[in-house]
């Protein structure tokens, strides 16, 4: 309704589609990685594909974030970020028919920690629709020190909540409930070893400290480095980087995925469940030289325990899906609900954004990936495309600012 306000899709791992592929949630005055919590223009809308893409307002207040659509597509949830004003976050549930909104719960403190300063812009809902998980920064109760990051789980009916995970290195959790009905408690998480991202306070002022690790260690800057554990504090081999785990939503039952942080292969920080299965796909980074690298798509099965090794993990199975595409430069991706189709963006050596689509076979098979669309140069469209598929796999969605304005796009595949 305002051509001067940018719009885009919500991050590709978000649960924002109805299972029949007829409706989805998107937002305006946002960018592909989130939004400004103080921007009143940032709002969520419901897009109805059966009604020519008509948009219906879902929110009308400042501070909306972390949306989720229930697995049956009938209930929409979002959170209100009141961290800076009241030190809390509020779970809300608007009626999709009447628009009337009700408060379902408030997260303030678990007795030791309270949410603070940073709200991860995505939530994730369990496959039985009973619980939602979010991630925030943490501060100790009645203290101005904000030393850690945490994963909260809230019951959508009772409003009861628990802090199930916390630590300095959980700054970018990419939390994702498994969508398999038989695994309603399993959550995929990301552990950024070496990351701190501390927020420091000086009186009433606060600021972001240095030390965030997205995928590599803080000093890498795409330099070729060996990443491994070392007992020598002066060693260059730090053990920094990220790896992936699956945990239960009570904080127990750790499992590990056989990928990354072995000195050769790094996780990029983009991963998702393969449809409604219990397998996970992640994008990796392997340096050929200090300035050149390939980015593969790897499918994995987890194994029990909280350990960190790649190919020597007993019981851990993996398959390089993108091995038939040379060179591989896959970054952000998603599958359909059945886990039989995939879409990914691809940054070519000449700086062009490409869109690839394809089919997935049995565990062990290479993906049938093929070039589908040129999305333009990264110079003209620097924002990440973050593509994903409708649950039925018939539509692909991506972001682009090639026109001069960031917008959300849809591509009919069949």
Task: Describe each PLM feature range.
Residues 274-295, 302-308, 318-365:
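Loop/turn-rich, solvent-exposed surfaces of beta-rich toroidal or solenoidal domains
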Residues 14-23, 28, 67-80, 117, ...:
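Blade-terminus and WD-like Trp-Asp/Gly-His loop motifs, strongest in beta-propeller folds
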Residues 44-50, 91-99, 147-159, 232-252, ...:
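Beta-propeller blade signature
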Residues 383-414:
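Blade-level signature of beta-propeller repeat domains, shared across WD40, Kelch, NHL, RCC1
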Residues 258-264, 320-333, 364-389:
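Conserved blade-ending motifs and adjacent loop-strand segments that build the rim/top face
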Residues 29-39, 81-83, 134-147, 189-240, ...:
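Short, conserved, GDST-rich strand-edge loop motifs in beta-rich repeat architectures
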Residues 5-16, 28-80:
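Blade-loop segments of beta-propeller domains
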Residues 57-142, 146-149, 163-170:
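Asp-box/WD-like beta-propeller blade repeats and closely related beta-sheet repeat scaffolds
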């Amino acid at each position: 309704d305002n051509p001067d306000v940018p719009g885009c899709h919500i991050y590709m791992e978000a649960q924002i589609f109805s299972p029949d592929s007829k409706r989805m949630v998107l937002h305006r005055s946002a960018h592909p990685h989130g939004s400004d919590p103080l921007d009143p223009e940032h709002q969520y809308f419901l897009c109805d594909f059966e009604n020519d893409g008509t948009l219906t307002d879902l929110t009308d207040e400042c501070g909306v974030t972390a949306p989720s659509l229930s697995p049956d597509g009938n209930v929409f949830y979002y959170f209100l970020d009141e961290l800076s004003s009241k030190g809390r976050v509020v779970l809300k549930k608007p009626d999709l028919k009447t628009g009337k909104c009700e408060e379902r719960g408030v997260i303030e403190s678990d007795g030791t920690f309270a949410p603070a300063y940073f709200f991860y812009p995505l939530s994730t809902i369990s496959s039985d629709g009973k619980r939602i998980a979010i991630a925030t920064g943490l501060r100790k109760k009645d203290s101005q020190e904000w030393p850690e990051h945490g994963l909260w789980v809230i019951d959508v009916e009772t409003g009861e909540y628990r802090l199930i995970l916390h630590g300095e290195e959980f700054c970018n959790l990419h939390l994702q409930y498994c969508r398999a009905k038989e695994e309603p408690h399993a959550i995929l998480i990301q552990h950024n070893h070496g990351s701190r991202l501390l927020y420091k306070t000086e009186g009433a002022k606060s600021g972001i400290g240095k030390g965030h690790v997205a995928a590599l260690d803080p000093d890498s800057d795409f330099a070729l480095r060996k990443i491994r554990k070392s007992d020598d504090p002066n060693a260059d081999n730090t053990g920094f980087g990220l790896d992936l785990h699956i945990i239960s939503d009570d904080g127990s039952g750790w499992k590990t995925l056989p990928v990354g942080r072995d000195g050769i292969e790094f996780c990029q920080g983009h991963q998702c469940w393969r449809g409604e299965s219990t397998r996970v796909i992640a994008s990796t980074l392997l340096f050929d030289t200090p300035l050149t690298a390939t980015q593969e798509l790897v499918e994995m099965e987890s194994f029990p325990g909280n350990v960190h090794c790649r190919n020597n993990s007993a019981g851990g199975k993996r398959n390089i899906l993108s091995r038939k595409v040379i060179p591989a430069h896959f970054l952000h991706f998603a599958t359909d609900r059945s886990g039989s189709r995939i879409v990914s963006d691809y940054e070519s050596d000449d700086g062009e954004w490409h869109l690839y689509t394809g089919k997935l076979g049995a565990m062990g098979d290479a993906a049938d990936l093929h070039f589908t669309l040129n999305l333009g140069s990264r110079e003209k469209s620097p924002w990440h495309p973050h593509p994903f598929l409708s649950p039925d796999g018939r539509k692909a969605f991506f972001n682009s600012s090639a026109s001069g304005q960031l917008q959300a796009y849809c591509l009919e595949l069949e």
